[in-house]
Amino acid sequence: THCISSAASDVYKRQIYKIEFYAAADGKEVMAEFLDSLPPKHQAKAFREIDLLERFGSSLKEPYVKHIDGEIWELRIRFSSDISRIFYFTWNFNTIVLLHGFVKKTQKTPRGEIETAQKRLLDYKSRHALTTQNQ
């Protein structure tokens, strides 16, 4: 007989995800800078949510993540009355690229924030397409 239940076995088979912070073509670490800009406790909560995303990937659902548009999803972070969002997409099945973060001030997500994420997604893909084809 097996010592490990099938449910426990499924945990071991779970897809392993890698988190990557988007950096601009000039090397500017825009995602790292956003996270550094958050107050310490809000930053800690953001890293906790990023850890959940890394562990569970596409199986993570609301209230943690929400589909925004096309390939773009948002990681939803709330600390006290502060709300922030991190837009991301999945690349090559198991790499989650964090594209753009912002502190949310209004009920509706500003279109400009989504557009920034979309531009960064296209930039990331254009710079990484060749390396993917060579693997």
Task: For every predicted segment, state its role.
Residues I4, H42-K45, T109, E113:
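Generic hydrophobic secondary-structure packing signal
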Residues T1-Y12:
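Single conserved hydrophobic/aromatic residue that forms the stacking wall/gate
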Residues F21-A23, L98:
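Structural signal for conserved beta-strand scaffold positions within catalytic alpha/beta enzyme cores
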Residues A24-H67:
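N-terminal first-folded block
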Residues K104-Q135:
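Well-ordered alpha/beta subsegment
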Residues K13-F21:
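Conserved N-terminal entry element of GNAT/NAT acetyltransferase domains
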Residues S58-Q107:
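Basic/aromatic recognition patch in beta-strand/loop cores that engages polyanionic ligands
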